[in-house]
Design a protein with these regions (language model features):
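Bacterial N-terminal signal peptides that target proteins for export
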Residues: 2-12
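Serine/threonine-biased, Pro/acidic-interspersed low-complexity stretches characteristic
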Residues: 4-5, 24-27
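N-terminal secretory/membrane targeting signals
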Residues: 15-18, 144
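C-terminal segment of classical bacterial N-terminal signal peptides
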Residues: 17-25
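N-terminal edge beta-strand
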Residues: 29-76
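Beta-strand cores of secreted/periplasmic/IMS beta-sandwich domains, seen most often
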Residues: 30-31, 66-96, 134-147
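Extracellular/periplasmic metallocenter environments
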Residues: 32-33, 38-40, 86-87, 119-166
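The feature marks short-to-medium sequence segments in extracytoplasmic or secretory-pathway proteins
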Residues: 90-126
């Protein structure tokens, strides 16, 4: 049996503390702050602004999603979501784009994305105005869309891209 003087053992323990912190911080989730916004219930809702691989001009959108940062490394990502609307319920759903050159499957009669077919990875469900929620998901490298799937909102431009790198 090897005997270490108490002071030497204490010195080793203190020296190891920064390493323990590095391990836990390396495994911590990336935090993304998300704002769900709109220009008010009295604004006429824009249409035809859903994600399109060819590009779409979101400057006409009357509602949207802002995420910062817009990228993260693969692994755990925590989305802190706030509904900044004064009078409209919104939600945030994380959708994986298996092929970013294709639009999400849209159910026109219901004015929403088919979440099951689209690759739903998790959501912060229907937040009342001013409310917040969080979601932590493990994401692989690729392109994702953050969308609001309340009927009509996605087509009104309520989405943003989110990229996960290696």
């Amino acid at each position: 049996m090897i005997y270490f003087p108490r002071r030497l053992a204490l010195a080793f323990a203190i020296a190891a503390l920064p390493l323990a912190g590095a391990v836990s911080s390396a495994s911590a989730a990336t935090v993304v702050n998300v704002s769900l916004w709109d220009k008010g219930a009295d604004m006429e809702m824009a249409t035809g602004l859903q994600y399109d691989a060819a590009g779409v001009d979101l400057s006409k959108a009357t509602m949207g999603i802002k995420a910062g940062p817009a990228t993260a490394r693969a692994g755990a990502v925590t989305f802190h979501v706030k509904n900044d609307s004064k009078d409209t319920i919104h939600e945030m759903i994380v959708m994986y784009l298996a092929d970013p050159s294709k639009a999400l499957p849209y159910v026109a009669d219901e004015q929403r994305v088919d979440e099951d077919k689209a690759g739903d990875k998790g959501e912060v469900s229907e937040l009342d105005p001013g409310q917040s929620g969080s979601l932590t998901v493990n994401l692989q490298p690729g392109t994702y869309l953050l969308i609001c799937n309340v009927p009509g909102h996605y087509a009104a431009g309520m989405w943003t891209t989110f990229v996960v790198t290696k």
